[in-house]
Regions:
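Conserved acidic carboxylate
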Residues: 11
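Hydrophobic/aromatic residues positioned on beta-strands within the core alpha/beta folds
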Residues: 82-84
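Active-site residues of response regulator receiver
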Residues: 55
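Short amphipathic alpha-helix used as the core "switch/output" element in two-component signaling
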Residues: 64-76
């Protein structure tokens, strides 16, 4: 049996989540969505996704602040930070493990990556 790759999207913008979910379902990924950092962390621990998309600014915290912890716990996950602006990342955050996407994310741009 072929295992489908898993994608977790943590973003409070419902429309963006639905668009990305539709995109990844068409590519035969399993897709999970969370709209808060707390819910996203719970889902992350439950499913250990292959790909994580996390919004920079969520209602209950800043997504990038949790990235070092996520890197350690999930070293095989590919991390993608979503932001409405090009953020300045802290020096202690390993940018080599991270792809930054600026909103709005185009499906064409995703096609170049996935």
């Amino acid at each position: 049996m072929i295992m489908r790759k898993k994608v977790l999207i943590i973003d409070d913008e419902v429309d963006l989540c639905l668009l990305m979910k539709s995109y990844f379902l068409r590519k035969n990924y399993e897709v999970y969505i969370a709209h808060t950092l707390a819910d996203g962390m719970n889902r992350l621990n439950q499913i250990a996704p292959d790909y994580l998309f996390i919004d920079y600014n969520l209602p209950d915290g800043l997504g990038w602040e949790r990235l070092p912890e996520m890197y350690q716990k999930f070293p095989h996950t590919h991390f993608h930070l979503i932001s409405a602006f090009r953020p300045t990342m802290p020096d202690d955050l390993d940018g080599s493990k991270l792809t930054v996407w600026e909103k709005p994310i185009s499906l064409k741009a995703l096609d170049h990556f996935f």
